[in-house]
UniProtKB/Swiss-Prot annotation:
It catalyses: alpha-D-glucose 1-phosphate + ATP + H(+) = ADP-alpha-D-glucose + diphosphate. Its EC number is 2.7.7.27. Involved in the biosynthesis of ADP-glucose, a building block, required in the biosynthesis of maltose-1-phosphate (M1P) and in the elongation reactions to produce linear alpha-1,4-glucans. Catalyzes the reaction between ATP and alpha-D-glucose 1-phosphate (G1P) to produce pyrophosphate and ADP-Glc. PANTHER family: GLUCOSE-1-PHOSPHATE ADENYLYLTRANSFERASE, GLUCOSE-1-PHOSPHATE ADENYLYLTRANSFERASE-RELATED. InterPro entries: ADP-Glc_PPase (IPR011831), ADP_Glu_pyroP_CS (IPR005836), GlgC_bac (IPR023049), GlmU/GlgC-like_hexapep (IPR056818), NTP_transferase_dom (IPR005835), Nucleotide-diphossugar_trans (IPR029044), Trimer_LpxA-like_sf (IPR011004). It comes from Mycobacteroides abscessus (strain ATCC 19977 / DSM 44196 / CCUG 20993 / CIP 104536 / JCM 13569 / NCTC 13031 / TMC 1543 / L948) (Mycobacterium abscessus). One of its GO terms (biological process) is capsule polysaccharide biosynthetic process. Signal peptide: none annotated. This is Glucose-1-phosphate adenylyltransferase. GO terms for molecular function: ATP binding; glucose-1-phosphate adenylyltransferase activity. PROSITE patterns: ADP_GLC_PYROPHOSPH_1, ADP_GLC_PYROPHOSPH_2, ADP_GLC_PYROPHOSPH_3.
Length: 404
């Protein structure tokens, strides 16, 4: 049996997330709450920890306080065996400037790699919702002999322009990689589908250091992992693709096998929440064999009183539903729904309060939003456009701490 290779995890968590505004007005995109008990970064960290990759640096930059605090409070490892998950804010090690791209973030953090001296480096994004066993991808990478392995997934061709598109041969060697093309290529067996990058990479350490340094010396580069680093290695014939569909996660159901969602827009973020609420959810939060770990608050259980009810919904700890109706919704912790209120098809983040007789439909309410007595959100869309952000799909998004 082969000894476990020495692996360093680097999580790219500096994203601003402009398309998720107002949810990112006060926090980095990976810190946005999700699913009633988590933040977006919890999915990648859970996948790495479940696979026993226990040396992880999280590179942060944009409005990172809540993200840094969340990692420090909820992701403490023992440290006795050299295990750690540590947030690393931008250090300006190469002069008085911030990260100019994801590749530059690694270039400015090469000291972390030199300190750890790993054989392989797992470079994953921090803002997707999915389960994955990265050890299986590492095995594929080692077997392939490539400098980099890119995790790939099939998506409808109409959606592929938002991603890096991959063309590979039968062995998995990448022949072409185009970042966010206007006219994405279809796959050989399905012209209506495209094979795209998930933003997750595994590098052999020396190869990563060499290509990062070469990119840093290129004045014409945008210093982006998908736009610059991967195409360099593809051009040299040293990049392989790992098919995410072959990844077998313990406890996965037939419905959520190979589930992966980019939640970079309000509509995608909303839709991913709606994947959680059915009797047989598209994405199952209750897989104990591959748990997603999140907030570790000590809260009382959720409570339903005076005939309050919740149907096809996820309700977080500490929440109270009193003589109110909740349907097809996700309620985070410490949410209060008062008498006669109706919440339908909505996402309520921690500390939200919905007053007596109020109605909330097809909406995302950020932390500590208060909906006043008899108020309505998501009922009169034109009125909502005057007050709040409304997505292309008609989802009403109300920013943190707003009183309505």
């Amino acid at each position: 049996m082969r000894a476990s290779p020495h692996v360093l995890g680097i999580v790219l968590a500096g994203g601003e997330g402009k398309r998720l505004y107002p949810l990112t007005a006060d926090r980095a995109k990976p810190a946005v709450p999700f699913g009633g008990a988590y933040r977006l970064i919890d999915f990648v960290l859970s996948n790495l920890v479940n696979a026993r990759f226990l040396r992880i640096c999280v590179l942060t930059q944009y409005k990172s306080h809540s993200l840094d605090r969340h990692i420090s409070q909820n992701w403490r490892l023992s440290g006795l065996a050299g295990e750690y998950i540590t947030p690393v804010p931008a250090q300006q090690r190469l002069g008085p400037r911030w990260y100019t791209g994801s590749a530059d973030a690694i270039h400015q953090s090469l000291n972390l790699i030199f300190d750890e001296d790993p054989e392989y480096i797992v470079v994953f994004g921090a803002d997707h919702v999915y389960r994955m066993d990265p050890e299986q991808m590492l095995d594929f990478h080692i077997e392939s002999g490539a400098a980099v392995t890119v995790a790939g997934i099939r998506v409808p061709r109409t959606e592929a322009s938002a991603f890096g598109c991959i063309d590979a041969d039968d062995t998995g060697r990448i022949r072409e990689f185009v970042e966010k093309p206007a006219n994405p290529p279809g796959t050989p067996d399905d012209p209506d589908a495209a094979f795209v990058s998930m933003g997750n990479y595994i590098f052999t350490t020396k190869e990563l250091i060499d290509v990062i340094r070469a990119d840093a010396d290129d004045d014409h580069s945008d210093h982006d992992m998908g736009g610059d680093i991967i195409p360099r290695l593809v051009a040299d014939g040293r990049a392989a693709v790992y098919d995410f569909n072959t990844n077998l996660v313990p406890g996965a159901t037939e419905r959520d096998h190979a589930y992966w969602r980019d939640v970079g827009t309000l509509d995608a973020f909303y839709d991913a929440h709606m994947d959680l609420v059915s009797v047989h959810p598209v994405f199952n939060l209750y897989n104990r064999r591959w748990p997603i770990r999140g907030e570790s608050e000590n809260l009382a259980p959720a409570k339903f009183v005076n005939g309050g009810s919740a149907q096809e919904s996820v309700v977080g700890a500490g929440s109270i539903v009193s003589a109110a109706s909740v349907r097809n919704s996700v309620l985070s912790s410490n949410v209060v729904i008062d008498d006669g209120a109706v919440v339908e098809g909505s996402v309520l983040m921690p500390g939200v309060r919905v007053g007596r007789g109020a109605v909330v439909r097809h909406a995302i309410l950020d932390k500590n939003v208060v909906v006043g007595v008899g108020e309505q959100v998501g009922v009169d869309i034109e009125r909502d456009r005057e007050r709040f952000n409304v997505s292309a799909g008609g989802v009403v998004a109300v920013g943190k701490g707003v009183w309505i």
